[in-house]
Amino acid sequence: MSEVLNKVSDCVDAVFVLSVASFTQRIEHVKKQFQDHGIAFNFVFDYDPPEIDQQLLDDVFAESSMRLPHKSLVLKHIKAWQVAREQSYKRILIFEDDVFLCRDFTQKLCAGVPHIDKLDEGYLVYLGGSDTKVTDSFFLSDDVLVPQPIATTEGYITDLTAINKRLDWLDTNKVTLPADHLVRSIDSLIDIRQYWFREPLVEQGSVFGYFDTELDSSRSKHGRLYNVLRYRWNRFQRRKLRRWLVRMKLLLGMKID
């Protein structure tokens, strides 16, 4: 008889939220949201920008155009992986602090875990992507999990095998990329398979305008209304409209990307 999954804690060994101690609005947002969903979690406040010493930066990062806030976020992801390794957690869930969970997040996550359980060890499952470009084949899949490189890192599940491989890679390589590009790059180099939930479980508040962005200069130069409207348009045309167009291409016998 299969195990009944009712809570997020039934699905993963630990939940980490990466934040900065001075980001009070985001912290209160996370606390309320996760309380509403009944999710136990731990904040990662290690490596806030003012606390990072130069020696650590020199040890971890190579020369690049990355700003200190980007480096801080990379270090926070690494910290969560290190804790998972130290505690021998088999599977963890990592969020960034601008995450918004879908209304039925727990139900959808619990429904997806049996599919995650069938994956070979060494994986990452991305929970977002509602406004991100995907291939035509993404819309033709009937699977709950679709193989695809991640877009961003606001929410993902990963297992201990993948974590150990990433940390081993970092032992002998320096970082030149922000967190999302770094995870995508490392995983492709060390044979960690990445998947998306076909229907996203989370959104990113700094993308759709709820929070001011701290990292993305392309969004920070625009006003909140512009970012809200751009997000809604991208979500419509990259998901709903694309799904319809792919189905039309299939019916007409056109080439599918």
Predicted feature locations:
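An acidic/histidine-cluster motif and surrounding catalytic segment
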Residues: S2-F95, V99-D257
